[in-house]
């Protein structure tokens, strides 16, 4: 179990064929690495763990597993390793895997993960670029720019920067996004509780729900599914709402055109089949009751 003296955040590079990675980031002055066979009874996994390189130099930790031919064939046995890392909070991590998952607890800095098949889970990151051919992506808080591409369920608590999410098969749920957000899905619903800036949400199959669009503009589009958009109390809106097979429900009170310099929200909502609803957001009502 290699241990390195790391009084400051470090950079980590992971290159795996098949395997799972678990990273724990906290306030510490060292880094501990443990590489284990995924199945200790398999000779190929034991050999892969033994042959995995673990090197630390000039603030960078490199972990590279051997890439045997069996990792890339469906009949070959797939040598697999499990990697456990404990490191200082704020460290930057970049990892790739042919097949395998990445899970991080604690606060890390820049995070870039790519896997062919496997789940990705982060508790807190400064920046995130997460790509999976197939797998769920679960994130607590991202402080900066976010790019996610996968086929699976996407669940994000809060993004404090701009975001691009592309999901080819699965539902996408975002609690709060501060920056400009573009969310696209081929097959799955899209839900955003609170969008502070411009948001574009499009899906070919599934509903689109924006709990509150604080500033806009808003583009919400579905080929097959309902669209629901909430707007803050007291903010005028410009609406373009169209459904081919469904009903349009505008629950906003009529208002005069906003004056020069007055904030308003521009909304474009379209669906081929499904209802469209525009209303005052429940979060605005909740804030009014608390004041």
Regions found by a protein language model. Name each.
Residues 1-291:
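Intrinsically disordered, low-complexity terminal regions
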């Amino acid at each position: 179990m290699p241990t390195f003296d790391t009084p400051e955040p470090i950079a980590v590079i992971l290159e795996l064929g098949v395997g799972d990675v678990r990273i724990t980031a906290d306030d510490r002055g060292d880094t501990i690495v443990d590489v284990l066979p995924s199945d200790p009874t398999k000779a190929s996994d034991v050999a892969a763990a033994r042959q995995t390189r673990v090197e630390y130099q000039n603030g960078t930790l490199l972990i590279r597993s051997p890439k045997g031919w069996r990792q890339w064939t469906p009949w070959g046995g797939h040598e697999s390793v499990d990697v456990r890392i404990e490191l200082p909070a704020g460290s930057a991590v970049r990892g790739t895997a042919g097949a395998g998952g990445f899970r991080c607890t604690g606060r890390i800095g820049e995070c870039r993960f790519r896997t062919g098949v496997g789940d990705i889970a982060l508790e807190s990151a400064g920046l995130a670029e997460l790509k999976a051919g197939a797998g769920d992506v679960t994130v607590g808080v991202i402080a900066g720019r976010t790019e996610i591409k996968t086929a699976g369920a996407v669940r994000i608590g809060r993004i404090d920067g701009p975001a691009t999410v592309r999901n080819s098969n699965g539902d996408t749920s975002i609690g709060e996004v501060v920056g400009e957000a573009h969310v696209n899905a081929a097959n799955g619903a899209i839900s955003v509780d609170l969008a502070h800036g411009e948001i574009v949400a499009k899906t070919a199959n599934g509903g689109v729900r924006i709990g509150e669009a604080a500033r806009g503009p808003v583009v919400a589009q579905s080929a097959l599914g309902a669209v629901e958009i909430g707007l803050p109390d007291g903010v005028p809106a410009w609406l373009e709402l169209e459904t081919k097979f469904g009903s349009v429900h505008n629950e906003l009170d009529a208002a005069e055109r906003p004056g020069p310099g007055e904030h308003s929200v521009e909304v474009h909502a379209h669906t081929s089949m499904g209802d469209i609803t525009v209303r005052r957001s429940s979060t605005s009502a909740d804030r009014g009751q608390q004041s």
